[in-house]
Amino acid sequence: MGIRKYKPTTPGRRGSSVADFVEITRSTPEKSLVRPLHSKGGRNNAGRVTVRHQGGGHKRAYRVIDFRRHDKDGVPAKVAHIEYDPNRTARIALLHYADGEKRYIVAPRGLSQGDRVENGPTADIKPGNNLALRNIPVGTTIHAIELRPGGGAKFARSAGASVQLLAKEGTMAHLRMPSGEIRLVDARCRATIGEVGNAEQSNINWGKAGRMRWKGVRPTVRGVAMNPVDHPHGGGEGKTSGGRHPVSPWGQKEGRTRSPKKASNKYIVRRRKTNKKR
């Protein structure tokens, strides 16, 4: 993937950029792997906004991605196409398995049309192959990692994401996460070799608010710009700093939200670095 920069022909184009999509080999998705996707607009079943700053955007169709590949152990597959997916930052690869089944996976860096992909303990250590952590050499870069055996990939699925396998001790594996956190994961959990492709996606400059609206992202209004009825930071004569420590619209203090008593804390060997205070 490369990034194409626009000339400043309009204020919205000044500084903006777009992906060149050179790796895409097909523009229409596999029909059997597409499901309808209904926009929620950030609202729950009662119609109340539970997630702010969502709504509108272009209509999308959901591509069913295979995050559990254990049922295809020993069945080779060929990469038929690399496709665009509007529901994630990474590209997706359409696999044609030898038994005739078709499935999508998140496309790793270096995987291209015509490549061969394998699953299972005997698979080679090359991008796109999926096997258990206990079968992967220490130091290997991996992505799409399960949190629990058979639970499907949960970690490192977005564009450019990768995790490093640092060590294996008994039934557990030490992983360095994209955030810098080092945590323990069951060695029976599966992962895919390589890093997720489309890493340059983070360098795209969206250029104007309208492009974010196409993505379904609505404006974020500062609390100090609101009235007192709308936010604890609202009101005041002229411009103010809010007059108190930063809080949410409901008065919750800004800062870390993870519970110090969370059960999975025992699996975190080293916390990620953060500037937030508890």
Curated annotation (Swiss-Prot):
Function: One of the primary rRNA binding proteins. Required for association of the 30S and 50S subunits to form the 70S ribosome, for tRNA binding and peptide bond formation. It has been suggested to have peptidyltransferase activity; this is somewhat controversial. Makes several contacts with the 16S rRNA in the 70S ribosome.
Keywords noted in UniProt: Ribonucleoprotein, Ribosomal protein, RNA-binding, rRNA-binding
InterPro entries: NA-bd_OB-fold (IPR012340), Rib_uL2_dom2 (IPR014722), Ribosomal_uL2 (IPR002171), Ribosomal_uL2_bac/org-type (IPR005880), Ribosomal_uL2_C (IPR022669), Ribosomal_uL2_CS (IPR022671), Ribosomal_uL2_dom3 (IPR014726), Ribosomal_uL2_RNA-bd_dom (IPR022666)
Residue spans of biased composition, Basic residues class: 258-278
GO biological process: cytoplasmic translation
GO molecular function, one term: structural constituent of ribosome
Protein name according to UniProt: Large ribosomal subunit protein uL2
